[in-house]
């Protein structure tokens, strides 16, 4: 009896403790709550006083481990190429030059990403890649040992152009194109054509270019750079700036169409410039090359739609490899047989038609092509920077080039503002769109050197004009890429309205 009574009393004590403890925690007026509150506040006050110990782990981990690993991988790759190819991998060889330019461009891009200026958005990495190649070319000791033959650089730049065209073709959404309002079409077509025409007129009278070369330069400058516009618009879109008016979506959708138009015009002018016949014969040859590229692109585009079939393993990888090899072969092959510009239009048509049937698998193929672009991007901008030599530039020539470029940009900005006047945007929004439609980078980095390489192979007597086109393209990237990124990052939050409620976001591309 005594034991049972003690057990009952013990159980009652436990029940009493468990019943009172939650009540004291729930009741904010209870003394227990105040005690626990003071204990928590004391611990919170003590926490900042604790010092974290910094130490280096053994073996190394993190960023330092990754840097050492990548360095060893690059060294092993160089050792392998040297053991197979010998002098090509030594200083002065092509592979050695490509490896130095590739690594320097990556380092230049990373350094530019690390530079942070208060209240200023980060600069695009491609600018660091461009400056890295420019530094390699213009430092005497380095330039003696880093050399890439023109044939090698031409093939790499043409391959980079192919990757850009594939991305542009796959990026064209047929549903969006079908339902696009007039404002998007105006933004994609109007500024590009007007800037190309303005640059042609200014270069003809200021730079003394023939008219065919003037329009060739105009279409080189007429393209906007999605590599600058799209990341900046995505940042603004994530923060809610201009989303209800559809400004980020408008600029991202129109950028691909703008590039397609500029590249098509460039290919047509390139065929005319480097053909040996008269004006009528050149026009007929251009129509033939366009017809051939369209027909071949449509036929092979439908082929790639269904081959490989959807039941194949690694479907996205096979599709990406097939479309990449087809398009690279077309671009390089058309240059080999003298049909300049045919491969570019073929690539656009093939990738667009093939992508319309791939539905969900299209995103996977785009990811594969993006990974390929990540490899060719530092090579492209590094090689473009390495083509520009300060010793060959004259101060008055640079002034003429900058004047031509600046006047063409002013025309583009003015035309963009005028075309947006009847689209339902406010004054500040029209100013932002006009300034955001200015940056140039990827297309100019490909088309400028392509003119130079074509002249070296087909018409050496036209090389002075091609060097001028190359220099203007370099200056266009150097001036507009960082300034455009900075203007979008700084003026976006100031000129665009911010919307916090995602349910109220509507895409309004009014006519």
From Swiss-Prot:
Gene3D superfamilies: 1.20.1530.20. The chain crosses the membrane at residues 67-87, 95-115, 116-136, 152-172, 187-207, 215-235, 260-280, 284-304, 337-357, 368-388, 398-418, 431-451, 472-492. It comes from the Eukaryota. Residues 16-31 have a biased composition (Polar residues). Residues 1-10 have a biased composition (Basic and acidic residues). Residues 1-41 are annotated as: Disordered. One of its GO terms (molecular function) is antiporter activity. Belongs to the monovalent cation:proton antiporter 1 (CPA1) transporter (TC 2.A.36) family. This is Sodium/hydrogen exchanger 9B1. It comes from Macaca fascicularis.
